[in-house]
Amino acid sequence: MHYSQTSSFGGNHTEIAKIIHKFLQPRVKQYPLWNPPSREYMSRAMACQICEVTINEMDTLLICDACEKAYHLKCLQGNNMKGVPKSEWHCSRCVQAFNGKPFPPTYGRATRAVATTTAKMPFRAAGVLSSSAKKIGPMDIKANQQKPIVSTFSRLQNTGLVSGAATTSQFESASVNAKTTASAAKTTNIGSQGSKENVACGANSPAPVSLTETPNRTGIASTISVINNGLISKPLTPVGTMSSTSPLPVVNQLPVNATSNASPSTPITASLVAQAPTVTQNGDGSSTASGTADHSILNADITTQVHTLTVTSSSNSQQAVSHSEVAKATEDAAPLENVSECEKPSESTSHPDSLNDKTISENVQESSKDAKVDSEACQNHPTASPATVVPDQDSTITAAPSVTQEDSAFNTEKTPPQPLSVSSNYDSQTEKETPNVQDSVHNVPGDSEKGKGLNGLDDRHQEQPSEPEFYKSDSVKEENAA
């Protein structure tokens, strides 16, 4: 059996331990007053070390971390103790015993540390949360403050652009499909306010017509430009003052003074210049409405510009643009009685039915005779002034509102241009009836190379204001016809 071996091994172990303790030197105690931790104060009542009274209330108890003796808080406050210490507390005896040396670790410190940490953690966590909330709060406030700033800035920008766009200009566009071979250019000045109109027409092809109104404080020239595709044509405008007035009070008149540079042998197609009635407001609240329309055809003669309208139509042309606005503007005008007696719309205007039956030379002769009869009839009314003839000329031109651009288109393919044939009797009559033709012709600018423009006509009107306007225009036209 092996029991003897086990007993010998156990005895050897104890002997070895004893031998070791003999060789080991005992350590010097670092803390002579240090006692192992105990829990006696938890199981039994403790007396105060100052007043020696048993402490029954836990709220008034304070234990030293070194000697673990109890003290009353009231007794300690009497010994110049201000309050309960937050960290470890040692009594005066232990402090004097250690004399500045570090205190030994105590059992209660760990327990109290856990208690203090658990008690302080919510406070610290709350403090951290409050500080983070304080940090997040201002950030949110700043973000909330920045959002309105950004939105207001964007709004200010939008309103500024809109207001700027609204105050700078107003655009009105209208697309009209037009088929025409006519071309003309006309420039007029309208008082203190005007409008700029650009009209583009292509030959035998639809083209958009855009109207753009740009208000301006200063005067703006009203320009109507027509683009032609390859046809030989020149701008034609009557000599004199042409304007049509509406029932509204007219303040600013529209003078148009121009001459033609076309030669009699040059084939020139019918030209159409139309301007929609424009209404301008003055400072005193009054408004003016003016609309001008010129329908003129020149086949090597300019006598039919003012009083007659000879239009050669073709069956292949199509109606594209209507002149109802111009007709309404001129029909509403109220001509004076003296001028209405002088004018004869039936004689001055040729109907579309007779256009196909008459040749170009016959039309020119009849129109010149009608102009001569009108001038003789109008001479019997010396009281008529140039200003009174202005609306009547427009009413004569637009007496047939049914005449459209279809009638104004000239058929160059079917009717070739022919030179003008004027009889000698007509030349002798014009020379006898108009002795001042030579004087008036020199004042009219026939060629652009001579440098004589509209100023010559204006000076002629200023020198002889008493002479009627229609008489001068007839004399000029007869001279050009000769």
From Swiss-Prot:
It holds the Pfam family PHD. Residues 377-386, 393-428 have a biased composition (Polar residues). Keywords: Metal-binding, Zinc, Zinc-finger. The keyword Zinc-finger applies. Residues 447-482 have a biased composition (Basic and acidic residues). GO terms for molecular function: zinc ion binding. Residues 188-210, 314-482 are annotated as: Disordered. Transmembrane segments: none annotated. InterPro entries: Zinc_finger_PHD-type_CS, Znf_FYVE_PHD, Znf_PHD, Znf_PHD-finger, Znf_RING/FYVE/PHD. Signal peptide: none annotated. A zinc finger (PHD-type) spans 45-97. Residues 314-324 have a biased composition (Low complexity). The keyword Metal-binding applies. This is PHD finger protein At3g20280. It comes from Arabidopsis thaliana (Mouse-ear cress).
